[in-house]
A protein has these predicted regions:
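Bacterial N-terminal signal peptides
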Residues: 9-17
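Sec-dependent signal peptide cleavage junction
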Residues: 16-30
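Short, well-structured active-site flanking segments
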Residues: 28, 124-145, 216-220
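Beta-lactamase-like hydrolase cores
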Residues: 30-106
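Active-site SXXK
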Residues: 97, 107-137, 151, 268
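Mid-domain, small-residue-enriched loop/turn segments at the edges of structured enzyme/sensor domains
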Residues: 101, 148, 159-215
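A conserved catalytic-loop motif detector
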Residues: 196-251
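Short, Gly/Ser/Thr-enriched beta-strand-loop segments that form substrate-interacting elements
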Residues: 232-278
Length: 278
């Protein structure tokens, strides 16, 4: 399983930016659009599961043990010259609850991965009856239903920016997204509020939130499975399992975050910047 994870990481690290119009301007321009008053909710920080009983770890192999996992990641970073400036990763096994994080709170250009918590936010509003799926969201008359498809599957930026600014100002949108994150004020770099910056811990928190409530968001999961390109990023090295993901590509940032439906389903968030250029 871990060998597969590293193959997936490599696929992202060495990705060549795609010549796709939807990726031409991933970073939201901070331009005001008509605001819609929506609740800016926060959740209290969630507690991580307690460490596994040492007695249970005694029978695990070096590859599966947390220390072995850390060593493998160390070797991987060294081999591909990955540093705190160009790489961050968060991994979580949903069955064993084993996790690994490296550089996970470092703010990096999120590219189109920002569309995952953004769409999740609107799906929750729909489920709560706060907005209708046929509500008109753009000046061109696109409904929220259509916006979800275009934002997640086609990674359309204009549509996604319209959704973003319907929440309010850019800082208000960023505050609204914190509903899905466990990071405290002190843990969040202020640059988070200044531009399209996120970190892999934020994306992992979002993936955990979504995975724990999959039955509430079947369309979002399905759109993530359809997300184009079908043979790129995480899916470049994965053919034997379903993957629900949201990729991002913008000026050297090659990112992907998603759910892998393996025998042990796992969550993975990878951010890179200018990796694999030399």
């Amino acid at each position: 399983m871990l060998r597969k994870v590293f193959c997936i990481l490599l696929a992202v690290c060495l990705s060549v930016p795609l010549a796709c119009p939807a990726l031409a301007a991933d970073t939201p321009d901070v331009v005001e659009m008509p605001a819609v008053v929506t609740p800016l909710q926060k959740e209290p920080a969630a507690e991580e599961p307690a460490p596994e009983d040492p007695a249970e770890e005694a029978g695990t192999s070096e590859e599966d043990a947390p220390s072995g996992l850390a060593a493998l990641f160390d070797d991987f970073r060294a081999e591909y010259n990955l540093t705190e400036q160009n790489f961050a990763v968060s991994y979580y096994d949903t069955v064993t609850q084993e996790s690994y994080d490296w550089n996970e709170t470092h703010m990096m250009v999120a590219a189109s991965t920002f569309k995952l918590p953004l769409n999740l936010y609107y799906y929750e509003m729909e489920n709560a009856g706060e907005i209708a799926s046929d509500a008109l969201m753009t000046q061109g008359g696109a409904t929220l239903d259509l916006c979800h498809y275009l934002s997640i599957v086609e990674s359309n930026n204009e549509i996604s920016h319209a959704l973003l600014y319907r929440i309010g100002t850019f800082p208000e949108y960023k505050e609204a997204m914190r509903k899905y994150f466990t990071m405290t004020d002190d843990e969040i770099d202020p640059k988070y509020y200044q531009d399209n910056y996120y970190c892999t811990r934020m994306m992992m928190d979002t993936l955990k939130y979504l995975y724990a409530r999959q039955d509430e968001f079947p369309e979002l999961i399905d759109y993530m499975k359809q997300s184009n390109p079908q043979n790129g990023y995480f899916k470049a090295k994965v053919t034997e399992m379903e993957v629900a993901h949201k990729y991002g590509s913008f000026e050297g940032a090659e990112n992907d975050v998603g759910i892998f439906y393996a025998e042990h389903p796992f969550l993975l968030a990878v951010y890179t910047q200018n990796v694999g250029e030399s």
